Amino acid sequence: MTSNGTNGSATAYHASSTQEAIQAENDFAAHNYHPLPVVFARAQGTSVWDPEGRHYLDFLSAYSAVNQGHCHPKLVAALVDQASRLTLSSRAFYNDVFPKFAEMVTKYFGFDMVLPMNTGAEAVETGIKIARKWGYKVKGIPENEAIILSAENNFHGRTMAAISLSSDPESRENYGPYVPNIGCTIPGTEKPITYNDKAALREAFEKAGSNLAAFLVEPIQGEAGIIVPDDDYLQLARSLCDQHNVLLICDEIQTGIARTGKLLCHEWSGIKPDMVLLGKAISGGMYPVSCVLGRKDVMLTVEPGTHGSTYGGNPLACAVAIRALEVVQEENMVERAEKLGQAFRSGLEAIQNPIIQTVRGKGLLNAIVIDESKTNGHTAWDLCMLMKEKGLLAKPTHQNIIRLAPPLVITEEEIAKALEIIKAAVAELPNLKGAAEDKVVPPPEKKVKITLEN
């Protein structure tokens, strides 16, 4: 029987080959993703193996969910131990792990209270609902008139509220009507609230007036292509929120948990939001966990029966999340991300190939912008296909931007190997033609268009 890349036998629920997995997904699953054609069968740390046993370095980290590395043994142990004891109680009853998680996570990040959910999109929805509650009950906004604003090119998820905030046409097409009074345009105009545009932000607050309940923002825009704002952008947002009695909500679902060289990315600006949204790496990729952290007076606007989740705060999730956060501290991942991120960006800049137009990022959340006018007809997708052949996995966003975000356990040697692969791939790409091109980029993978990818 095929080993399935796992040093053991495949089971009935493991595809026995890359071809079988891709064909079955194409036949039986909705086509809402276009994955890079590689199949994960086993992973450890920064390493991934496909069913045939081929090895790759993971430079996406499940969109920064596996900051602690794939299948971290301490997280596996926490998961197995709790799974054999108690997995789910619902919030109809107390369990003996959620209270420990609630105390730990609030102290760990320096907030008063937490509301647990499961996915990042649920955390966004919860934050929006809490902000509206606060707007009506505390600020005194007239019923059904609360406004929630975000910035252009944001990514806050795929739910109706999230796409109502979005400016991405593909995310919104044929999903209307959208949730009213939330968006990323200046109220009363069609002008976007351009990210990192301080004048646009001031105008948005002025035009929204007293009905503005919250401004929701990513400290670094991830899906937009790792857009790092000026140091004073979040400082201005904090100041405007204070002046106008508005809640500042930071979406740290992708940027948080040590990814950018700070525990939370907004710390780079020296500000503190009223609410923080967390997900992804809060559980190290072991289990869906998310939460909203905030001030006590804000969080207590939500009364029993007005919001919840059957799985939110379940003991299995909480046990894994506690251990995941402990591992971040024990293994100095904040410091590692900052040090190794600087080295990685320096290495990317040293490649000095005109195909790499821009290098940007913080910590180990980075991106290269590909100048497709210099690739001899190839795309960033083609470059990712070529890097895959050489053993490195990454994906484009917004067509010509490649996000590079490995697990924070990556070693200096693995970074050096990744830089070698990237350098070789950008040098080889313009000359990739004929049979060699068809081998690397087979017909189904040609002319692939990628906008948002999460």
From Swiss-Prot:
**UniProt cofactor(s):** pyridoxal 5'-phosphate
One biological process term in Gene Ontology = L-proline biosynthetic process
Keywords noted in UniProt:
Aminotransferase, Cytoplasm, Pyridoxal phosphate, Transferase
UniProt superkingdom: Eukaryota
Keyword check for Cytoplasm, yes or no. Answer: yes
| Residues bearing the modification N6-(pyridoxal phosphate)lysine | 280
Q: Does the keyword Metal-binding apply?
A: no
Q: Which SUPFAM superfamilies match?
A: PLP-dependent transferases (SSF53383)
Which spans are transmembrane here? none
Q: Which GO terms describe its molecular function?
A: identical protein binding; ornithine aminotransferase activity; pyridoxal phosphate binding
Q: Quote a single Gene Ontology cellular component term.
A: cytoplasm
User: Could you tell me what reaction this enzyme catalyses?
Assistant: a 2-oxocarboxylate + L-ornithine = L-glutamate 5-semialdehyde + an L-alpha-amino acid
Where is this protein found? Cytoplasm
Pathway, per UniProt?
Amino-acid biosynthesis; L-proline biosynthesis; L-glutamate 5-semialdehyde from L-ornithine: step 1/1
What EC number(s) has UniProt assigned to this enzyme?
2.6.1.13
Q: Which family does it belong to?
A: Belongs to the class-III pyridoxal-phosphate-dependent aminotransferase family.
Q: Which NCBIfam families match?
A: Orn_aminotrans (TIGR01885)
Q: What is this protein called?
A: Ornithine aminotransferase
| Gene name linked to the record | otaA
